[in-house]
Design a protein with these regions (language model features):
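Bacterial N-terminal signal peptides
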Residues: 7-20
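N-terminal secretory signal peptides that target proteins for export/translocation
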Residues: 1-4
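Extracellular/lumen-exposed scaffold segments
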Residues: 24-280
Length: 280
């Protein structure tokens, strides 16, 4: 009778506990899924105390995929985690993109092997269900559907063999501007945006601009330089009631393996002191 009473009490306590999803088996990576001309898989790990998942993508030579702002041509990646249980995924963290000139305006994206990282929030256990679409492009752009499930707990993420891969993707994000690489000034002369980019050991630089919904921007070109700075011009136009001067724009600046993301206010070019850069 005493044993029965203990069993009944234990059962009552169990029923009173909040429902917690318990994974049957920890799974911190999925199998590689081949879908010509790319393959992909999901991985997960804990990095510096934060849980992350990542979509790893490998593209065949000559193929590309896209950044969150794909540019004049391309498809913006889309991801959905609403079918997940016990875990919530944050907005994707993108590596710094490259610009590819396809002859029709160009696009911003990646080639080879890379991926997209998602910060995770969960208590003890989680089942992460990812569905999405990424564009892959060569001569034509093709939407490629991706889907995979991971099941894990905190101990599994802490012991995951994918910590290094996710850390590498996190480090590939655009960094904060610093003396090593920074937009020194941004101005508009009525025809073009003028950017002065400075830094250390600069051989060349490239710029990607994130325009507003009423902006039309051309391709940047280097028009001047000195020992530690480049002057770039970007043909620009915006609606009269959305002037560029006084507004903040976002730029990605790349110098080799280094990349920064910087928000900077556009000033009236006629009011700025002229930079002593040699025009090309």
């Amino acid at each position: 009778m005493f044993a029965l009473r203990i069993m009944m009490t234990s059962a009552a306590l169990w029923l009173a506990l909040p429902a917690v999803f318990v994974p049957a088996q920890a799974l911190v990576d999925g199998p590689w899924i081949d879908m010509e001309p790319a393959r992909y898989r999901m991985i997960a790990a804990e990095v510096d105390g934060q849980a992350y998942a990542a979509l790893e993508v490998e593209l065949k030579p000559g193929w590309h995929t896209y950044w969150r702002y794909p540019g004049a041509s391309g498809l913006e990646p889309e991801f959905d985690f609403t079918e997940s249980r016990g875990v919530a995924a944050g907005k994707p963290l993108f590596p710094a993109p490259y610009f590819f000139d396809d002859g029709v305006g160009g696009f911003n994206g990646y080639e080879g092997r890379g991926g997209f990282v998602f910060p995770l929030r969960f208590e003890l256990n989680g089942e992460l269900n990812m569905r999405g679409m990424i564009g892959v492009c060569r001569e034509v752009c093709v939407p490629m559907e991706v889907a995979q499930k991971l099941v894990f707990n905190r101990d599994g993420l802490a012991a995951s063999p994918h910590r290094g891969a996710i850390k590498t993707l996190l480090q590939a994000q655009p960094q904060e501007p610093s003396d090593d690489l920074v937009i020194r000034s941004a101005s508009f002369d009525g025809v073009s945006l003028q950017l002065v980019v400075s830094g250390t050991a600069l051989e060349t630089v490239s710029v990607i601009t994130i325009p507003g919904p009423h902006d039309i921007l051309g391709l940047p070109r280097i028009v001047g330089r000195d020992e530690d700075a480049f002057l770039l011009e970007i043909p620009a136009w915006s609606k009269l009631d959305h002037p560029l001067i006084g507004r903040k724009l976002t730029f990605i600046v790349r110098a080799g393996a280094r990349a920064i993301e910087q928000n900077i206010q556009v000033r009236d070019h006629s009011l700025l002191p002229q930079e002593p850069l040699t025009r090309q």
